[in-house]
């Protein structure tokens, strides 16, 4: 089956996601336009790519700004085919969780704010304006041969920060209290302590509440709950365990204490985190004090790394293009105050792997990894492979921004700013799924040939999928016409490339004189 046919088949369930049939057809047409258009991926370029640049374009823009539809419904085809992509009937659903920033330059875009630039150097912090999103991608891999996993995005939730209200009275009061010399901290502190604090206005109280609700970790919890509901709604995935792999920013109390049912979290932890052992059953409590909840202090993750008494276990996992033996140390049933006394954890310390930049060079080592898991009895190969495969979501971010053009649309409506990037991520995810269902995980001869300077790739890249989709759309109308080449243009050029010159003036005068 062609990639175009499979992609069109996956778009058919979108009809139920939109209120009218013509709205669903318009969404499918824009999906093809956003994938096949060149340069910036704008709605106007998508309209031109579908050949409707001479028709009324207002309905295409109203699809994202006014039409009532749920962006989560666009990812339903991924969940419908998820059970067929897993290794077995008991295999867990592995999900990678991360946030990303889409840069914007407009000052009147709803939700755009200043944030830390991830491309800034480590010695100097830079700021940039952009839109924040929290993404979750399902990790699937081939079962018949060792190969890297493929991340299929299933959620792309906007996470705009709360807007701080402007209180003119508080600004004047603060300026009046600091009229003294700012270089005298004692005088300023005395003035600050001598006067009572100004009570918060209702707008400021609402801002503090929204600031907590719109934090990235809180949005991440909402994404996990939405994924669990989507899995429970299908008989093939309702009993499967949801295995979430996140980075250190999500390993905190907010996420660990609000995990949905049948959900396991794997995340990085500080090397100096204070852990505790389990409390013995018969433990005396000091008179007059509160009851103990934790046992003796356990070694920190860094101490576990350097402790030679703990056994070293080698786990077989696929990483960096081949199957490797990764050495780890484990410590089961430890407790962390951020997670609570009722949640036992599994500590996994991954020793740094040695590598050489060239043959015969000095042996270098990477940084160790300190992981915790909310399921102390989880299979170690599954745990470590899930953590290694989390890197695929970073590849999603790169392809979404550079090839799909997520958040490049020049829209200013609050709904369009949030739903247009979600629409683009949904069609990108369906394109990845269509390639797996049509051709499998390997890069076969069906794809367009690679240039001579590129090595053979194990799996097709996103650019390979876009080129193949464009070829299957635009090539059939040109099959009955001769394909032009550079030789055809060269044959049309005259034999004498130089223009014919007029005779010199001296020759002309001599001719006249003769």
Model region roles, listed by residue range:
Residues 66-184, 331:
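Active-site-proximal, Lys/Arg-enriched surface segment
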């Amino acid at each position: 089956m062609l990639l175009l046919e499979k992609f069109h088949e996956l778009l058919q369930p979108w009809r139920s996601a939109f209120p009218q049939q013509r709205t669903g057809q318009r969404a499918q047409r824009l999906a093809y336009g956003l994938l096949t258009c060149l340069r910036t991926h704008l709605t106007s370029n998508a309209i031109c790519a579908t050949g409707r640049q001479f028709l009324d374009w207002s309905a295409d823009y109203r699809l994202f700004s006014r039409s009532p539809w749920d962006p989560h419904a666009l990812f339903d085809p991924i969940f419908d085919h998820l059970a067929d992509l897993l290794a077995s009937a008991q295999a867990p659903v592995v999900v990678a969780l991360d946030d990303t920033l889409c840069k914007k330059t407009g000052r009147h875009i709803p939700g755009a704010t200043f944030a830390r630039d991830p491309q800034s150097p480590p010695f100097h912090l830079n700021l940039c304006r952009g839109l924040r999103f929290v993404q979750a991608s399902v990790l699937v891999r081939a079962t018949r041969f060792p190969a890297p996993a493929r991340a299929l995005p299933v959620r792309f939730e906007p996470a705009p920060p709360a807007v701080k209200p402007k209180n003119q009275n508080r600004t004047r009061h603060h300026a009046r209290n600091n009229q003294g010399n700012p270089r005298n901290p004692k005088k300023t502190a005395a003035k600050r302590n001598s006067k009572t604090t100004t009570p918060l206005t209702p707008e400021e109280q609402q801002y503090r509440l929204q600031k907590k609700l719109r934090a990235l970790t809180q949005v991440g919890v909402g994404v996990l709950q939405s994924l669990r509901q989507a899995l429970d709604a299908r008989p093939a995935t309702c009993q499967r365990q949801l295995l979430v792999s996140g980075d250190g920013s999500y390993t905190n109390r907010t996420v660990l204490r609000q995990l949905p049912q049948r959900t396991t979290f794997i995340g990085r932890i500080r090397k100096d985190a204070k852990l505790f052992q389990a409390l013995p059953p018969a433990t005396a409590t000091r008179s007059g004090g509160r009851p103990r909840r934790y046992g003796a202090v356990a070694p920190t993750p860094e101490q576990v790394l350097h402790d030679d008494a703990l056994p070293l276990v080698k786990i077989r996992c696929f990483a960096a293009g081949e199957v490797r033996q990764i050495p780890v140390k484990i410590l089961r049933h430890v407790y962390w105050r951020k997670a609570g006394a009722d949640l036992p954890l599994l500590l996994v310390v991954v020793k740094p792997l040695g590598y050489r930049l060239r043959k015969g060079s000095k042996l270098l080592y990477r940084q160790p990894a300190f992981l915790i898991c909310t399921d102390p009895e989880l299979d170690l190969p599954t745990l470590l492979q899930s953590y290694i495969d989390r890197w695929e979501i970073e590849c999603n971010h790169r392809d979404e921004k550079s090839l799909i053009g997520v958040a490049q649309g020049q829209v200013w409506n609050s709904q369009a700013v949030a739903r247009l990037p979600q629409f683009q991520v949904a069609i990108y995810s369906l394109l990845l799924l269509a390639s797996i269902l049509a051709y499998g995980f390997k890069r076969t001869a069906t794809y367009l040939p690679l240039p001579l300077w590129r090595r053979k790739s194990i799996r097709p890249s996103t650019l390979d999928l876009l080129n193949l989709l464009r070829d299957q759309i635009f090539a059939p109308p040109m099959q009955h016409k001769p394909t032009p080449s550079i030789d055809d243009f060269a044959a049309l050029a005259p034999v004498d490339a130089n223009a014919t010159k007029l005779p010199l003036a001296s020759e002309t005068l001599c001719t006249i004189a003769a």
